[in-house]
């Protein structure tokens, strides 16, 4: 048996600053892991949920998927309609399930019946929906609001999904953060680390920057400044 001891003296409370980055990105912290590579943790996360049957299809959910994708021609149309249905209809509700909670996602039968759960239940429902629609989809772990360090430790606080596109690339999806929103991945999660639980294993990934054209709020200002220094005008927001 090996025993590791870490100690530090005279530690003062961390002084926060206005608009600073997340505390986990600035304050001292200790990370430990018995996993040598991210790929190993990715495979483990995949196997834990596949062995449990987290995404096993059920007839009533299959009928809903068929209804939703009817008439949808492209893969993005199908992915979008499934993501938004799950986001809008599986309510976020954090209820303790006792011991055994963690990296195993609850199965579709439970989630579709209860229509509520935490992020892993919402993501798990979407993964099952995508698979019933013919897509290859898997769970992924992320740390919402702060970075994930390079050491492959368990420093995640949020569960999302990835779907494989026809191009062969994986696209991250977050149904928890996009209810009644046009996005498929919240722009608040740009350049955020995530780890897909895929059978071939994956290194730590980084979400892309959301293009400006995805955020088309335009402000037109028509103002006049008179000789007395008074500014009058109007703003039009579209």
Feature names for model-found ranges:
Residues 62-63, 98-109, 143-145:
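Short, conserved phosphate-binding/catalytic loop or strand-edge motifs used
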Residues 77-81, 87, 93, 99, ...:
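Active-site-proximal cofactor/substrate-binding loop regions of enzyme domains
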Residues 1-100, 227, 231-238:
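Secretory-pathway-linked proteins and extracytosolic
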Residues 58, 75, 79, 112, ...:
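Active-site-proximal structural scaffolding
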